Amino acid sequence: MSSVLSEYTIGGVKILFPCRAYPSQLAMMNSIMRGLNCKQHCLLESPTGSGKSLALLCSALAWQQSLYGKQLVDEKSDEKEWKKMERVTPCCCSCHLKNSDQTTFSSDRQMNSTDNAPSNISGASSNKTTLASKLCAKKQASFTTDQDDDFQTDRKRIRQSHDEQLQARKRRCYEKGVQFIDDDDDDDRDHVKFDSYNQRRASMDSCAEEAIAASSNHSAGPCSLCFCGQTKEEDKATEKCKKENGEKPKVPKIFFGTRTHKQIAQITRELRRTAYSSVRMTILSSREHTCVHPDIHSNRNERCKELLEAKDGHSCRFYHGVHKMNEQSLLQYRHGIDKAWDIEELVGLGKRLRACAYFAARELMQGADIVFCPYNYLLDSQIRESMEICLENQVVILDEAHNIEDCARESASFSCSDEQLMYARDEIDSMVNHGIRVSDHEPLRAVCYSLTNWIRQCSDQLVEREYEASCKVWNGKEILSIFHDMGITNATFPLLKVNLAAVVEKEEKITMFHGQENVIKIPTLSPQSQMVLKGLFLVLDYLFRQNNRFAEDYRVALQQSYTWTNRPDIPDENGFFARPRSRRSIRQKIMVYTLNFWCLNPAVAFSDLSSNARTIVLTSGTLSPMGSFSSELGVKFSIQLEANHVIHKSQVWVGTVGAGPKGRKLCATFQHTETFDFQDEIGALLLSVCQTVSHGILCFLPSYKMLEKLKDRWMHTGLWENLERIKTVIKEPQGGDKTDFDKLLQMYYDAIRYKGEKDGALLIAVCRGKVSEGLDFSDNNARAVVTVGIPFPNIKDLQVELKRKYNDQHAKNRGLLPGSQWYEIQAYRALNQALGRCIRHKNDWGALILVDDRFRSNPKYITGLSKWVRQLVQHHSTFNGALESLTEFSKNQQQRMQMSSTNCDDEPSQGTSSSSKNTSPTSSLLEFTVHPTQSVSEFTQPTSSTQSSVTSPPEIAIPFSPIQASLGGTAPRDNAEVLSHWKEEQRRKSNTSIKTNLMKSFEKSKSNYSKQRTSFYNYFKSNAHTSTPRQSSSKTRESNLEICCNELASGYSASANSGSLSQGFGRENNVSRKQDEGLNESCQEILCNAVPLFHCTNKETHASVSPPRKYVEPSVSMLPEDNTDTDITIHCTPELYDDDGQENLVSDEEDKCNEEKENKIDSGRADKDTNACALDTSVKRENLFHKEEYLNVSGNENAFNIGRNKGTEQKNRENRLSRSRNKGVSSFFLD
């Protein structure tokens, strides 16, 4: 997608999109706009990687901003209307007439009291106001007089109209500054004859001030003679609405819910990309993620509440700093968080400001336009109450909502053990005994006693279901009768709610002690007891709501089980033998009773959202099958969408495998999975896939039980060891700490990123586990996903069994799905969620392998898959056929990926320095081009280019050949052969062998053609600058050499198609000398550009990547003679890599010795006289030499010096080191 900002207008709303939208994104935004504008609910499925989160954010926020824009326009229009109403002539009703006359009289008195005012202006103003009052009085008299209008003379009616026109004309003149001398006194006297006016005038003369004080009362009263009464009523309603909504109608907030906090972090990263990144936002999270107190590491919820209550006299100092970051303006303008932020940024800011991030995020919700939170914050009524979340007339978006049914059922359910109930009972009993809020605690104590006694009575009625597990189930009506016997009814439950609210409320009591106030905090119940009581009352609230409407949706189950606990081993005081000290505790099996209130209808909890929210949007990549959401949630989704994927069908391999490598049928039912044949066949299949597909592979199993069985079997047979030889094998843990899980994930990512002897990693996980939900395995992190079987829920689970029976019971009257169909849908959603871990963006590719014969034999299992998966699925009857197809797919995609990595690199911009790292052009033909200066260009011919008509400086294109010669053979002629050849060489040979071949190729080039020096060499020599490399470790130097090798290898793989390498590379003697010199020169430029230790800066000449052009081989006649024998070696100071005391080792004698050796090598004579320059060195000197030799391989010397004879180099450097050391040694040691 392009990075250019795109603009779309959908539903009358302008949407700014950060890139060109996919068709699926446009379809999603269209559906969301329809739902928001029409207040309808949406059910939208878009495959993972199709950009649904971006579409959700941009469309919802654009709609919200459009409402703010409309609100601003309405406010401006209202102001204009009010201004127009103020300019209109005053109302002619009695109340306004009296107010107008009083205002006139007051103004007359003010004008009379002002002596300096001009008389003409005063008279005009007074006359003007008086005339207006008189006209209003006359009009009022026409309404109040007993005479009919038909009996009035025509002259008076015409006179009235004339006066109105005259007064209007005068008002306009007054506004222009014109002054009048009124001569219509006779007319004024005629108007005074009206009785109504005389009465009002007399009253104003007698008590002017009282009339002014009473004018407001008359003007505020209702009036039936004009429209002002209706206007006042509307104004009162508007003012009331403004007061209720905070001075202006509120724009709906957007509550964006996801399943985990990690998904919230991904959403905020997407929001940062958009044009709406500066939106006012907040993230609601738990104390576990936001607490910044350094002394609290565990049980943060309880410890936070204790610090807030300050039971030990010390309160939380971070809580008192919330005001530093509790407003949106503070974040944006003072602290610089002006774009979408993550919860980690808020926590970091809280630590810096010593302010609580948990309470700051809650305070920021008041002014936020979009609120991010896990969606159980929206479904659970207790969390909504504690977080003060109001969803009335708000927009609710639930992403990754494929598990929303299960989450809704869990939020309306409650479970507790008999031990928890007895703990709450004893604590309440203690409160009553100490006389603390006795009237409120006693009813709650009675409830706890009743439940614990009932559990003890029913313990003998339990029915055994399996080994050491018994239970009994009651339906809604039965449990209501049981609660009625306990005294908990529709009438008494509201009173119990009042008692619970009173006991959990904090209270302080002030007493006087020795004349001083003493504040005593009244004790409250512990958080554990409060949690038990609140959960119990939550269920009771649903049971008694709306005349027991949801009673049939509940089942109450009492279960008996056994668990192992660690109990301290207390020695017997009367015991004769002493026990060992190391024996601290003993494990003991105890019986546990669990009371479960299970909600079987998700619509119970979801009804709070559907009845209050303006629009609900459910979206996920795996909503299919979508038919159950409307019936299960009790919400009509008027807008539904099932979008297509954005990838091409060639980027994904989807196949079903029904047989293993040995031909055994694979059907992952409970009976088959218990056999060793099935377990061995699955292991052999997984091993073959690991050998075929490189990088990361995910394998999903139906349950943790099956995972443990397979691991034990494979460890016994040695297959687990075989898997570890190919890939790093990681197993998903069941439960455990979050930090441990994150470490395992990081281990998996690192094994793929830093591949050594092993080719990636294998992660074996479980459907519905942590790995299958919301984690991003893009690109190499998941090149294949293997699913074994169909992850049906445990059919023996009591809750699953009750849910199936419930659906069968209410399928006809409520439209629910039958129990068997609901059971299958749960399996499909879990399977689709696991398959969605692969293919995370448009350019991604991967294989989806479904291992189970049921997919091939029964088509109904294919219909449950996502739309984009079932369109591409292929059935393979044998494993060999599937493996061949998978191998071909993997090779093709790897070749395409390598080609796209070359094609997708950015072209270098104009003016790029030659010292920067070169990037590949958009074609597979790679050529390094030397841009000569004007002095050199006169010896060259211009290069013809068929791809560009823009005139460019003369250039000489120099392709690579040393690497290709080192890797052997004739150059491949097409891209596929080049890439496959390089891939095989790279995997077959280690890095050491590649470096050896590189040095050999340069050695050949140097030994054969070192005497042929051209003007290019002189030019580079004259412009080369020496630079001092920085000191680095051997590991860094090795990585730099690998960078150089990769650059040269990429040039080899690309230059093979240029056509200029059609000659055999094994015949070096037939290659043109000038061409080989050009090759050496290009390699020199590569070493300068690729290895960051060296900086070959040239002001006029630089090496850069240019578009492909025809190769022009420079002829000898085009180049001037080179009369200089000086070497063009790029000088670097090797002493920086020696010890601190070994500085300044190079001397004039060493240079002479080097020149003599070079002359001998250039003349082709054997180097036999170098022994005269060599001295014996110690072990320390040999180590120093090895360091310098390694640096020379990395580019410390000229490209030609890489091929220098090793024996000559060793003796030469030994001589240099020994001589320099002798110079630096004190004469005391030399004597």
UniProtKB/Swiss-Prot annotation:
Transmembrane segments: none annotated. ATP binds at residues 46-53. GO terms for molecular function: 4 iron, 4 sulfur cluster binding; 5'-3' DNA helicase activity; ATP binding; DNA binding; hydrolase activity, acting on acid anhydrides, in phosphorus-containing anhydrides; metal ion binding. InterPro entries: ATP-dep_Helicase_C (IPR006555), DinG/Rad3-like (IPR045028), Helic_SF1/SF2_ATP-bd_DinG/Rad3 (IPR014013), Helicase-like_DEXD_c2 (IPR006554), Helicase_ATP-bd (IPR014001), P-loop_NTPase (IPR027417), RAD3-like_helicase_DEAD (IPR010614), Rad3/Chl1-like (IPR013020). Residues 152-166, 1206-1217 have a biased composition (Basic and acidic residues). Residues 890-903 have a biased composition (Polar residues). It catalyses: Couples ATP hydrolysis with the unwinding of duplex DNA at the replication fork by translocating in the 5'-3' direction. This creates two antiparallel DNA single strands (ssDNA). The leading ssDNA polymer is the template for DNA polymerase III holoenzyme which synthesizes a continuous strand; ATP + H2O = ADP + phosphate + H(+). GO terms for cellular component: nucleus. [4Fe-4S] cluster binds at residues 291, 304, 316, 356. Its cofactor is [4Fe-4S] cluster. Its EC number is 5.6.2.3. DNA-dependent helicase and 5' to 3' DNA helicase required for the maintenance of chromosomal stability. Involved in the repair of DNA double-strand breaks by homologous recombination. Involved in the repair of abasic sites at replication forks by promoting the degradation of DNA-protein cross-links: acts by catalyzing unfolding of HMCES DNA-protein cross-link via its helicase activity, exposing the underlying DNA and enabling cleavage of the DNA-protein adduct by the SPRTN metalloprotease. Belongs to the DEAD box helicase family. DEAH subfamily. This is Fanconi anemia group J protein homolog.
